[in-house]
C-alpha cells in the first residue's frame, strides 16, 4: 500500500518522464510538487519506491529515476486522470469527421489518421475476426489460358478476394475440368465460415477429388489458403508508423527495423486479441516482439452488430496516457455513431 505522498511522487515521475524522456530527480520534484518536505525526504521516498519495484534502479550517470513496468501498471490502474484540455478537442474531431461522407473503411482510416496526428504515436485498427464472422457466398475460377486461372471468392458480407495462379502442371487445363472443380468447391464450401473452409480445402479427400481434374492440386490448394489469409491482412490498418522515429527510445536503427518488421498485419493480429475493455500490453509481456520500452493500448470498437474490432496506439512506455486514453475511449464509443452520422 503506497502512502499518498508516494503516490504523488510516482505520478509526478511518470508524467515528467513522459514529457522529457529523462530521469526525474528529487530536486525537480521538490520544486514542482510543493509537498512541504525536504529534498532528502523525497529522495528517501524515491529509494523506497525503487525497493518496492515501482522505479528502476538508479543510473549513476544521472541523479534521477525512471518508472518501471510495475510503476506504469500501478499508475494506469490507480493514478491516471483524463486530461480535461485534451477532452475539449473531441468536438474538433467531430467536425472533421462530419464534414464529408465516409465508407466504413474510409472512416476507420480517418480515425487512425487523427489518432496518430493528435498523439504523435502509431495508430492501429484491426477489424473483427473475419475468418469467424464471414461465410463463403461464391467461389469462381476464371479461365485465362491453358495454365493460368484467377481464383475469386466472395463472402456473405460482400468482401471479395482474388488471386492469379499459374499452374505448374504438364498437361493443359481444359474449361470442362475447371467447371467441374467450381461445382465441387461451391458444394463443399458455400455457406461455410472462412476458417472452416480453410480446414476443409486442406483435407485429404478434397485434395484427392481436385487431383482428378488438376494435376498440381497442392499448388492449387495453397493458393486458396493464401486468399483466406488475404482476407485477414486486408482487415488491418496502420497510420503514423514513422512516428516511431521521433521517439528517443527508438533512435537506434536496428531497434527501428525490428519494430517496423513486427508491425506486419499478421503479427499485429496475434498481439491484439479482441477484448471487451481497454487493455494495456507492455513489451515485457509480449513474447512475439523481443524489444523493450513500448506499450500497446487497445480498446474495442463497434460499427454495427457484426463489424467489430479494436483500435490501438503503439508508443513508448512513457507515452502521455492521460491524453491517449480519453481519445481512444471517445473514438471507441462514438465510432458507430460517427458512421451513422455520415450515412
UniProtKB/Swiss-Prot annotation:
Keyword Repressor listed: yes
Keywords of this entry: Repressor, Stress response, Transcription, Transcription regulation
GO molecular function annotations of the record: DNA binding; DNA-binding transcription factor activity
SUPFAM superfamilies attached to this UniProt entry: GAF domain-like (SSF55781), Winged helix' DNA-binding domain (SSF46785)
Keyword match Transcription regulation: yes
Record-stated family: Belongs to the HrcA family.
Function of the protein: Negative regulator of class I heat shock genes (grpE-dnaK-dnaJ and groELS operons). Prevents heat-shock induction of these operons.
Record protein name field: Heat-inducible transcription repressor HrcA
Organism: Phytoplasma mali (strain AT)
Gene this protein is translated from: hrcA
Amino acid at each position: 500500500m503506497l502512502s499518498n505522498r508516494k503516490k504523488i511522487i510516482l505520478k509526478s515521475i511518470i508524467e515528467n518522464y513522459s514529457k522529457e524522456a529523462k530521469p526525474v530527480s528529487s530536486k525537480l520534484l521538490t520544486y514542482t510538487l510543493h509537498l512541504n518536505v525536504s529534498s532528502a525526504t523525497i529522495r528517501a521516498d524515491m529509494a523506497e519506491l525503487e525497493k518496492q519495484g515501482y522505479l528502476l534502479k538508479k543510473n549513476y550517470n544521472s541523479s534521477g529515476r525512471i518508472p518501471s513496468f510495475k510503476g506504469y501498471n500501478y499508475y494506469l490502474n490507480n493514478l491516471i486522470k483524463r486530461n480535461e484540455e485534451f477532452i475539449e478537442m473531441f468536438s474538433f474531431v467531430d467536425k472533421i469527421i462530419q464534414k464529408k461522407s465516409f465508407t466504413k473503411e474510409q472512416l476507420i482510416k480517418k480515425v487512425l489518421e487523427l489518432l496518430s496526428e493528435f498523439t504523435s504515436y502509431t495508430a492501429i485498427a484491426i477489424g473483427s475476426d473475419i475468418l469467424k464472422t464471414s461465410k463463403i457466398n461464391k467461389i469462381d475460377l476464371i479461365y485465362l489460358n491453358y495454365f493460368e486461372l484467377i481464383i475469386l471468392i466472395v463472402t456473405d458480407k460482400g468482401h471479395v478476394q482474388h488471386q492469379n495462379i499459374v499452374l505448374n502442371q504438364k498437361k493443359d487445363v481444359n474449361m470442362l475440368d475447371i467447371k467441374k472443380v467450381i461445382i465441387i468447391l461451391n458444394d463443399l464450401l458455400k455457406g461455410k465460415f472462412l476458417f472452416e473452409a480453410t480446414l476443409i480445402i486442406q483435407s485429404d479427400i478434397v485434395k484427392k477429388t481436385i487431383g482428378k481434374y488438376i494435376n498440381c492440386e497442392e499448388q492449387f490448394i495453397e493458393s486458396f489458403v493464401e486468399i483466406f489469409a488475404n482476407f485477414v491482412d486486408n482487415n488491418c490498418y496502420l497510420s503514423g508508423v514513422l512516428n516511431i522515429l521521433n521517439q528517443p527510445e527508438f533512435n537506434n536503427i536496428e531497434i527501428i527495423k525490428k519494430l517496423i518488421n513486427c508491425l506486419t498485419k499478421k503479427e499485429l493480429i496475434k498481439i491484439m486479441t479482441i477484448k471487451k475493455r481497454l487493455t494495456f500490453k507492455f513489451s515485457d509481456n509480449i513474447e512475439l516482439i523481443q524489444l523493450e520500452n513500448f506499450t500497446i493500448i487497445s480498446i474495442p470498437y463497434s460499427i454495427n452488430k457484426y463489424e467489430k474490432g479494436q483500435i490501438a496506439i503503439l508508443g513508448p512506455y512513457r507515452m502521455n496516457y492521460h491524453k491517449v486514453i480519453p481519445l481512444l475511449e471517445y473514438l471507441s464509443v462514438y465510432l458507430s455513431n460517427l458512421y451513422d452520422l455520415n450515412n
